[in-house]
Amino acid sequence: MSENVPDDLQYTRTHEWIRDLGNGQVEIGITDHAQQALGDLVFVEVPQVGRELKAGEACAVVESVKAASDVYSPVSGTVAARNDALGDKPELLNSDPYGQGWLMRVARRSAPADGPFLKATEYAQFVEEAG
């Protein structure tokens, strides 16, 4: 299984990625490893705009032909945008997990309490060691 782990993102041990948008918001999605493990995704449920999230809280659901899995918010804040395209095209999570397959954008409330996050090299090593 060949993993795609972009250097410009941060990662969690629960296989979410975080992209700092530079405007107080972060974009969040699931990693290439997560989408490969789940298989073909058939349903995605993302939180409503305006929902308050706490770091570590289950906030979205991704469902494949094999399993359903919770997605955990890596940060605390307010949902500022959600990727409504996933409602009609959940397969975007499989084909482009770091681009068109983003799940939500969150206006961060308290960056210091978030994390710890992994750098790309640390996440790649974590995935490799986990088998």
Enumerate the language-model features and the residues they cover.
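Acidic, low-complexity mobile loops and tails
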Residues: 1-55, 91, 95-131
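A general structural signal for short secondary-structure boundary/capping elements
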Residues: 61-62, 75, 123-128
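Mid-chain, well-packed structural core segment of small domains
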Residues: 62-100
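Short glycine/proline-centered loop/turn elements that form peptide/ligand docking sites
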Residues: 23, 58, 65
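Short, well-structured beta-strand-loop connectors
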Residues: 48-62, 78-81
